[in-house]
Each structure stands twice: as structure tokens, then as C-alpha cells.
């Protein structure tokens, strides 16, 4: 068994974020992972699910591990530049998403002024 195949098998046995980071040799700040662990793992899972159209068995271990590493980096960086609320990966956060404020362009705004009354020379309203 090659070292890459062995590493791929080890990847499949990983169960913590730190194990993925260590195995794929991705630097990380433990504080970022501690706060965003589930969100990073969810983002990572979604990223790898979209790789190779589900045909991982047909892809070499070297390519798989390279692509998994890139996906983990994307997942991690997503939470170093934004928050879990920004990404809303979990249903509980999606359900609490604020409704976007309605936008009314200036061209649609009209002003109606009350009719003014005018008087003639005799003081009567017209």
C-alpha cells in the first residue's frame, strides 16, 4: 500500500477538525477552530461533496488529498474573514436570517402637496 493510499485511509478515519488540519498539513489558529469548529467542518463537508462529481474512487489518492487540502483551507479561511452568522450553514441560523429591507428607488418616490386655496379680490375662495 502506498503512503498516499495510507494517508487517504487515515483521512477517512478522521473525526475531529484538528485531525483533518494535521493530516492535510494545514496551519490553523486553535482559537478560530475552537469557536467555529462545527461550521468549518460543515463547510468542508460541503466543499468535498462537490469535488469530482462523487467519483472519488476514480481519482488518484494524490489528487484527492490535494483537493481535500484546498477545500479545508477554503473552509478555514471562510471563518477567518467572516462569521458563522455570515455563512448561515445550519438550519437554526438560516431560519433566523433577517428579512432584507425593502428597497424603493428614488424615482418611485412622489410627493403630494395638499391643495392650496386661493382667494379672489372679494375674499372668496376659488
Curated annotation (Swiss-Prot):
GO biological process per UniProt: nitrogen fixation
Record key words, sorted: Nitrogen fixation
InterPro entries from the UniProt entry: NifW
Chain positions covered by the region annotation Disordered: 104-126
The organism's place on the tree of life at top rank: Bacteria
Keyword Cytoplasm: no
Main function: May protect the nitrogenase Fe-Mo protein from oxidative damage.
UniProt cross-references to HAMAP family, sorted A to Z: NifW (MF_00529)
Stated family: Belongs to the NifW family.
Quaternary assembly: Homotrimer; associates with NifD.
Protein name from the UniProt record: Nitrogenase-stabilizing/protective protein NifW
Source species: Parafrankia sp. (strain EAN1pec)
Gene name in the database record: nifW
